[in-house]
Curated annotation (Swiss-Prot):
Key words of the record: Chromosome, DNA-binding, Nucleus
MF annotations from Gene Ontology: DNA binding
Family of this protein: Belongs to the histone H1/H5 family.
PROSITE patterns from the UniProt entry: H15
Name this protein carries in UniProt: Histone H1B
InterPro entries on file: Histone_H1/H5_H15, WH-like_DNA-bd_sf, WH_DNA-bd_sf
Biological process, per Gene Ontology: nucleosome assembly
Role this protein plays: Histones H1 are necessary for the condensation of nucleosome chains into higher-order structures.
Coiled coil ranges: none
Database matches in CDD domains: H15
Major localisation: nucleus
Subcellular location: Nucleus; Chromosome
Length: 42
């Protein structure tokens, strides 16, 4: 699910002040073979 992908990305990025939506999206696209739906990008 998207929730699990986002959670894994946040934990992996380990950014001190939180992870931006762009950073999360980039991490997920680089580490998983999926294509985002337009609604996810909002």
């Amino acid at each position: 699910t998207y929730y699990e992908l986002i959670k894994a990305a946040i934990l992996a990025l380990k950014e001190r002040n939180g992870s931006s939506a762009q950073a999360i999206k980039k991490y997920i696209l680089e580490n998983n073979k999926i294509e985002f739906q337009q609604t996810f990008l909002r």
